[in-house]
Amino acid sequence: MLSQLSYTPNLALQQLQYNMTMPSPNLEHQLEKMQRDWDQRARENARYYVNTACSDWSDEEFFRSGERTVAEEVLTDMINICQGIEPRQMRVLEIGCGAGRVTRALAQLFGEVVGVDISTEMVRQAALALADLPHAHVFQNNGKDLTVLGDRTFDFAFSSIVFQHIPSREIVENYVREVHRLLRPGALFKFQVQGDATLSTSPEDTWLGAPFSEEQAVQMAERCGFEPRYRHGAGSQYFWLWFFKR
């Protein structure tokens, strides 16, 4: 069941305090480690590390699993996502495209799909997998921003089982802020984060990422210019958030 997130309209003081906070000194190290670890995982078995349900995915099964994700998280939510726009007229952004599992399924539905990933090897494999889809594009980003996408504007952004691996809430928030910059006004960023704070995490761990509480999610939305309208799965690994650009 979806429920609405409450938020405080004016967080000017909190915004000022946040802006005055210097980035954590190990941020660059974490980003480098994320890229290095995910490149290694991609070379070892990209599809397994994208979806650990199987260690020997066939092409058909792997991309069908992406279709299931889209069926469960996108097709059931088209009113919030499309907002009256025809899907084939929409440009969609996927954060953490991996080997193109979900990207391909999104491209079957929307007019243009752009995926980004921090891993060079994941992006290489995704580009090969999507070569037959001229309206699907993938780029490697640096983990700090989305300047690689230039001045494109997007109608919807999506991310599934990606942020749950990021060891720093600061890095996740940088992504959220950059997505806000690229979305049209009113558009939705639907994404999932790690919500289970009972799990032991480490800044060096690029598999089990930093958890978010409901309060932390709301505060992040407000700092980044979003309305945090809905949430589902708080306290679990699959904590879904619906952020609408103000």
What are these regions (language model features)?
Residues 147-157:
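A short acidic, Gly/Pro-enriched loop at the edge of an enzyme's catalytic core
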Residues 124, 160-164, 177:
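Internal, well-ordered alpha-helical scaffold/interface segments
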Residues 10-146, 169-170, 188-246:
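Class I (Rossmann-like) S-adenosyl-L-methionine-dependent methyltransferase catalytic domain
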Residues 156-170:
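A short SAM/SAH-binding and catalytic strip from SAM-dependent methyltransferases
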Residues 173-185:
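A short glycine-rich, Lys/Arg-flanked "PGG" loop and its adjoining helix->strand segment in the class I
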Residues 3-5:
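Short, positively charged low-complexity motifs
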